[in-house]
Amino acid sequence: MRHFLSLNELTKDEILYLVDLACRLKSEVKRGFFFPYLKHKALGLIFTKASTRTRVSFEVGINQLGGYSLYLSKNDLQLGRGETIEDTAKVLSRYLDLIVIRTYAQSEVEEFAKYSSIPVINGLTDDYHPTQIIADFQTIFEEKGRLKDLKIAYIGDGNNVAATLLVGASKLGLDIAVATPKGYEIKKEVVDFAKDEAKRSGSNLIFTDNPKEAVKDADVVYTDTWVSMGQEEEKEKRIKDFEGYQVTQELMKLAKEDAIFLHCLPAYRGFEVTPEVIDGPQSKVFDEAENRLHAHKAIMVFVCLGRI
C-alpha cells in the first residue's frame, strides 16, 4: 500500500511503469477485455472542487477494474461541519479501500494520507495535479513512441499543472521550457526540486517570459487556463497580464513540424489558445482526456497492488 500525492515521491522507473501500465490497460479495453484487478474494492471520492474528467474517469475506471465508487462531497460529510481530517481519515479507512481527494490545499491531502491506512490519491490541489501528468506522458508516448530526447514547452500560468509537468519532465530526463509572465512563475521550491532532479537525469530546464523562445523546436506545446478555480475574481487582471501568451498557429510554427498540442482542459478558446490550434490536426487534447481514464486505472492498481 502506498499513497500518490505528487510526482516528487516517484522514481523515473515508477513513472515509466505507470505510463506502460496505462497503455496496457487501455489496450485491454480496446480489445474488449476487462480484468477485475480491483474486484470488490470500494473507491471514495472526496471533492471540494468541481470536476468533469477526474470524477468521471475515476468512477468509470474503478468499475472497469471490478470495483465500485462512492462520491463524497465535503458538504455531505461531517468534515464539512468541523470533524477533523484525522478522524475522517481513520473512519473512512475502515469502510473504503482507496480514496481520491480533489481539494485546494496540498496540506489537506497530505494530512489525510498521514492518518489513512488505505491509499490516498491526489486528484488535484492548488500545488500539484499528478494524475493529469501521467495521462499527459501516456499521450506523448503514444504520439512520439518514446519518453526521451524530447522537448516540452509550457506556455502560461505557473500553476499546479505546470509545476507537476516540470517535476515529471525533470525526473524523466525530458527537456522543458516554461514561459510565464512575471509574477506567475512556478513556485521557487518546485523549481529548486526540479533543478536537483535535472542534475541527475540530464534534463535541460529553461525558464523565460518569452513564449517564442520556449516553443522553439519543441516536440510538445502545452498550455492551461489562465484563470483556475478559485481565481475568478482575478479574471480581468489575469487576461491582461497574459496578453501575448496565447498559443496560436504562428506560435506553433516555431515548434517542430510534427509537434503536438496538449491542454488538460477545460479550455477557453480565444484566451489561452485559439480555436485553430486546439481544434486543429496537431491537437491531441481529446486523446489526452481519454487517457485520464486509463492513467487513473493504472494509478489505482499501482497504489493497491504494486506492480502487476
From Swiss-Prot:
Subcellular location as annotated: Cytoplasm
Q: Where does L-ornithine bind?
A: N160, D224, S228, M229
Offer one Pfam family short name for this entry: OTCace
List the catalysed reactions.
carbamoyl phosphate + L-ornithine = L-citrulline + phosphate + H(+)
Write the record's keywords in alphabetical order, separated by commas.
Amino-acid biosynthesis, Arginine biosynthesis, Cytoplasm, Transferase
Q: Which GO terms describe its cellular component?
A: cytoplasm
Molecular-function GO term, any one: amino acid binding
Q: In which pathway does it act?
A: Amino-acid biosynthesis; L-arginine biosynthesis; L-arginine from L-ornithine and carbamoyl phosphate: step 1/3
Q: State the SUPFAM superfamilies in the record.
A: Aspartate/ornithine carbamoyltransferase
Question: Coiled-coil regions in this chain?
Answer: none
Residues that bind carbamoyl phosphate: S51, T52, R53, T54, Q78, R102, H129, P130, T131, Q132, C264, L265, R292
GO terms in the biological process aspect are: arginine biosynthetic process via ornithine; citrulline biosynthetic process; L-arginine biosynthetic process
The EC designation for this entry is: 2.1.3.3
So what does this one do?
Answer: Reversibly catalyzes the transfer of the carbamoyl group from carbamoyl phosphate (CP) to the N(epsilon) atom of ornithine (ORN) to produce L-citrulline.
Sequence similarity: Belongs to the aspartate/ornithine carbamoyltransferase superfamily. OTCase family.
The molecule here is called: Ornithine carbamoyltransferase
Per the UniProt record, the source organism is: Caldicellulosiruptor saccharolyticus (strain ATCC 43494 / DSM 8903 / Tp8T 6331)
- What lineage is this protein's organism placed in? Bacteria, Bacillati, Bacillota, Bacillota incertae sedis, Caldicellulosiruptorales
